[in-house]
Amino acid sequence: MGSVSLSDIQVTPLARIATDGGDVMHALKKNDPDFVGFGEAYFSWLDHQKVKAWKCHTEMTMNLIVPFGQVRFVFCDLDSEPEVFRIEEIGDYNYSRLTVPPGVWFGFQGLKVNSSLVLNIADIPHDPSEVKKLGEHEINYNWS
């Protein structure tokens, strides 16, 4: 894994097509430019104002989508002094996919009253040995 920058995170607006029976929501196509492979897809529920932070995948490319709710993703460059952050909010009001390369520290927070749902379409199956973790307060970011 080479050096990674917060600018390497891709934001792709996604189609949300209204139909009589309910919306059709696109996620990821094999021929999308940022598709690098399929290993696993999994969902994570996130309660209102709750935070899940901080993680860094050393091998996994994540494709993060919020099909229900609204979520603030905070990405951090720990090599900068002081730390540099990039914030992306996706979901009901900005239906998009975030493609995050390996080596980026991140956390996320639920913004919708009740719950939000995050989908990760990863290029490899989940492997706990390739994940680094820090506690929520170990990176100096104010979630309020």
Predicted feature residues:
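Non-catalytic, conserved peripheral segments adjacent to functional cores
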Residues: 1-97, 111-144
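Glycine-centered loop/turn positions within well-structured domains
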Residues: 106
